Amino acid sequence: AVGYTVSEEYIGEALKENPHSFYLATKSMARTYEAMKKDILGSLDRLKRSYIDLYQIHNLGEADYELVFSENGALRALKEAKEQGLIKEIGITSHSVSVLDKAIDTDEFATVQFPFNIVENQGEQVFRKAKAKGMGTIVMKPLAGGALKDARLALRYLTKLDFLDVLIPGMADEKEIKVNQSAVEDDSPLSEKELADIKYLKENMGDKFCRRCGYCMPCTVGINIPMQFLLEGYLKRYDLETWAVDRYKSSDKNASDCI
């Protein structure tokens, strides 16, 4: 994504010898025609490619929906880029079911992307609607933002759902790549133990997680709200108490400053 620091540069460098050997997707938070046009050209340059397979409108919310679809909106730039052969398909990502539901009805997009995992299934009807229209479905947050520690179980669960096409878990090292690859290549039915573990997670973890979408920002007193939840996760899920507490205390504003 354009906003993910140097990710496009790194991928471009890694694939420069054979840039079209992978199906590549990226995305932009641009909402206007000129801003999106600039981002598309920038992505092509950073990725060292003559075209991008899938270019997505990144995290579209209700506030910007009308602008994106307007004459001066980002969608126009994407459609022009597709006509010019600079991108092959146009997609949309969001943390809002209602936004994706409306976007699907426009028939402007090849793919939709939404959070979905063992404990968060609010997007099922959106994904089913998209599949019924021949669209591709992409799952973000398949591990619930790190809350699901058993990556193999989390991914195997998702591969058994016929309305999901692509899973995009984050991977930090080669070991995680191998675990994820093994999970999605295992086409055996879920075992009784796996089903029991899934049932336990559904019943005990709840379905409310911070996805760091930024909808809660800005805070009126300057608290970085997503960071508060991120540090909580490091404390409770990864047992990094000293690190998490130190980071929390060093913040300019934290939860104790909430009015």
Question: Which stretches of residues belong to each language-model region?
Answer:
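Short beta->alpha linker loops
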Residues: V2, V6, S28-R31, S94-S98, ...
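Alpha-helical elements of the RecA-like P-loop NTPase motor core of helicases
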Residues: E9, E34, D101-K102, K175-K178
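Short hydrophobic/aromatic-enriched beta-strand-loop microsegments
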Residues: F22, F109-N117, S188-E194
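Hydrophobic/aromatic residues located in beta-strands of well-ordered beta-sheets
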Residues: F22-L24, I90, T137, L167
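Glycine/proline-rich, positively charged
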Residues: R31-I138, L143-G146
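Structured C-terminal cap/extension of enzyme domains
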Residues: E124-I259
